[in-house]
Amino acid sequence: MAARCWVWGFVVALLAVAAAADGEEEEGKWEPLIRMPTEEGDDAEAAAPAPAPAAADYGGTRWAVLVAGSSGYGNYRHQADVCHACQILQKGGVKEENIVVFMYDDIAHNILNPRPGTIINHPKGGDVYAGVPKDYTGHQVTTENFFAVLLGNKTAVTGGSGKVIDSKPEDHIFIYYSDHGGPGVLGMPNLPYLYAGDFIKVLQKKHASNSYSKMVIYVEACESGSIFEGLMPENLNIYVTTASNAVENSWGTYCPGEEPSPPPEYITCLGDMYSVAWMEDSETHNLKKETIEDQYELVKKRTSNANKLNEGSHVMEYGDKTFKDEKLFLYQGFNPANGNITNELIWPVPKATVNQRDADLLFMWKRYEQLNGVSEDKLRALREIEDTIAHRKHLDSSIDFIGKLVFGFENGPLALEAARSSGQPLVDNWDCLKKMVRIFESQCGSLTQYGMKYMRAFANICNNGVSEAKMMEASINACGRYNSARWSPMTEGGHSA
C-alpha cells in the first residue's frame, strides 16, 4: 500500500470518525526457509555461540556509540533499531564497556507494549532489549551528552553511567544514529536538536585529538544526507553512510497494515528501512569477509525498495572513501556463528513502507482503533489525532505565509523550498539558522518532529540575508492570532535550537 494512499485513506477515515463523534488481517507472505538470527525458537537459542574475543585479529579496541534520538511509543522503531544494533555488536564480541547506548527507555515497559519488558525489531524476531546497557536514558539523552561521550570528556557528561569513548590512536569507532531528522538537523528527545554544523566541529575535534584510527558512521533519518553534504571533510579518517540524500525522507518498515506486518497486537512500526537493511545484512554475513563497501551496496539496493523511491530512499556516502575495502568486523565485530555463512543476503522484501513523518499518525490511528466502544480514552485519542493534524496544517500555512511576506507572494514558496546544488552545505551561517528557528517558535509554536522538514526554509531565509527583525515581523503577522499554548516550546520541552 503506497504511503500516499494510506495518508488519504487515513484522512477520510478521520473525517468519518469525527463526524460520528459529533452526532481476517492478511497474513504476511514469508519464504519458509528464511529465519532471522533473532527469531524466536529454542533451537536458535540453543545454537547461540559464545561471543568472539573483542580484539581478535587486529591491534586496537572497537568502540561504539548507539543513539535512539526519540521518545514515545509511536517511535518504537528507533529504540528497537538501537537495541538490535547493540545485540549484533555484543554477539560480535564488542565488550559492553566499549558500547555507549543512548535511549530514552520508555518503550519496553510502556503500558502499550503487548510484550512487557521486551522489544522486537522484526515481525518474527525475538527480544532485542535484554542485556542492552542503559548508559544514558530519559533526560540524559541530549546532544551535549552525545558530543561529550564522543570526545571522551567525562567531566562534561551529565548523569548516566559516565561511560565515554576513551579511545586510543589505534582504535576503531562505530557510530549509529536512528530517529527523525530534517535538513541540517537530527532529532533528540530532549531539546535542542543536533545541528550539522556543530556535529562536524565535534568530529574535527575528535580527529585533532589523535584518538582513533578509523571511524564509521551510519545515520537513519529524513534528509540525513544534509548533515554531511558540503560539510564532511575527506581527511578525518571517517566514512559515513546515510539513509537518504539531503532532500528526501527515510522510511519506517514492518508497520501495521503493511507487508510484512508486525504481529497483530503491535500498533506501531517495528523498524526503519535503512536500519533493518544493514542489521539483517550483518546478521547473515561473515563480517570477516564482507567489506564496508559490500554492505553499502547491498543496503543501498534494499533501501531503494526495488527503485520505488516514492517508498524508499537513496542511501548516500560521505567523508573518506579510501578504506571502504576494510572488513566490517573491524567495527561491528565477528559472530562465530556466521563463520561458515556464504555471502548471500537473504531477506523478506517489504512490499511497502511508511514515511517517517507519517508513522506517528499511523500509530495514533491504530491506537484509536484498538480502543473499544465510546470511552473517555477513545475520545482523548481522537482529540490527539485532531490536534496533531491541526498543528501540522498550522505549520504548513505559517511557513508558506512567512515565505510570501519575506520573498513576495509570487516567489515566496519557491524561495523557501529551493535546494542548493550538490556539494554545498544547507546554510552558510548555522547561528543564523538557530536564531530564525527560535524566532519562529516564539510566535508560532514548536516545530515538532514533523516541522523539522522546514529547516531548509529557515536556511534559505538566512542565505538570502533576511534580518532577524524582518523574520520576527513576518512570524508575528503569520501567527499572531494562533493560540500556541498546547504547542508552546515551553510545553514541548524547550526550543528546537
Swiss-Prot record:
It is an enzyme of class 3 (hydrolase). Its EC number is 3.4.22.34. The keyword Transmembrane helix does not apply. The record marks 269 as: Required for post-translational maturation and enzyme activity. GO terms for molecular function: cysteine-type endopeptidase activity. It is found in: Protein storage vacuole. The active site is at 180, 222 (nucleophile). Glycans are attached at residues 153, 340. It comes from the Eukaryota. Residues 1-23 form the signal peptide. Gene3D superfamilies: 1.10.132.130, 3.40.50.1460. Auto-catalytic activation. Pfam families: Legum_prodom, Peptidase_C13. GO terms for biological process: protein storage vacuole organization; proteolysis involved in protein catabolic process; vacuolar protein processing. It catalyses: Hydrolysis of proteins and small molecule substrates at -Asn-|-Xaa- bonds. GO terms for cellular component: protein storage vacuole. Its main location: other. The keyword Nucleotide-binding does not apply. Keywords: Disulfide bond, Glycoprotein, Hydrolase, Protease, Signal, Thiol protease, Vacuole. Disulfide bonds join 255-269, 432-462, 444-479. Belongs to the peptidase C13 family. Asparagine-specific endopeptidase that may be involved in processing of proteins targeted to vacuoles. Cysteine protease required for post-translational proteolysis of seed storage proteins in the protein storage vacuole (PSV) of developing seeds, by processing of proglutelin precursor to mature glutelin subunits, thus contributing to the formation of protein crystalline structures in PSV. This is Vacuolar-processing enzyme beta-isozyme 1. The lineage of its organism: Eukaryota, Viridiplantae, Streptophyta, Embryophyta, Tracheophyta.
